[in-house]
Amino acid sequence: MKKHILYSFRRCPFAIRARWALRKSLIRVELREVDLKNKPLDLIKTSQNKTVPLLILNNGLVIEESLDIILWSLSNSNVADQKKYLPSNFENKILNLIRENDKEFKFHLDRFKYSNRFNDVNKDFHFYQAKTIIKKWNDMLEKNFKRNFWLVGENESIADWCIWPFVRQFKIACDHQNISNYFDDPMIQWLNYFETNNFYNDV
């Protein structure tokens, strides 16, 4: 049977989380790594956004947003996984956390990590704003830490999947500093879970 096709870029956090969800959902795809400076014509023709990740299903349906790819992956996994990774009683909280990451945190992360790409940007201000959000997430992890390991509820959820690649980028951008300056122990262990997971090298 014809495989689904995923256009991806290895270091892109949106693409990382899409690949993670597909891997966790045991959905096999034909992975096509993209040179962002020389995008393939098929991607340009197919995608309105003209960027990654882009999933083309074997029936021709196109899914462009990473969160939509994640939700599609879950909908095509078993019912137990759907309830585990997006439990109905925490769905709104999970989706709101993802929105906070995708809108607010990424806005400040980009202007801290890539400050030379923006005009009149105060790098330190955006670092502080990103760090404040990190602290909020760390407090959520710490609150749950004695009972479990996750941002929301008792199990790993798509909130964890969606946010950890961006926290990793923040850590990389701060690599000249001691990690304990901006991450407390729960956040360090949470991120370490993903970076040392057997799936990590696969995605």
Question: How should these model regions be labeled?
Answer:
Residues 151-176, 194:
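GST superfamily/GST-like fold recognition
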Residues 111-113, 193-203:
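Charged/polar, low-hydrophobicity segments characteristic of intrinsically disordered regions
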Residues 126-133, 181-196:
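Extended, well-ordered alpha-helical scaffold segments
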Residues 39, 90, 154-163, 183:
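Short, conserved alpha-helical segments within structured domains
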Residues 100, 136, 165, 169, ...:
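Alpha-helical scaffold segments in carbohydrate-active enzymes
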Residues 139-153, 198-203:
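Surface-exposed helix-capping loop/turn segments at secondary-structure junctions
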Residues 1-138, 142-143, 148:
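GST-like domain detector, emphasizing the conserved glutathione-binding G-site
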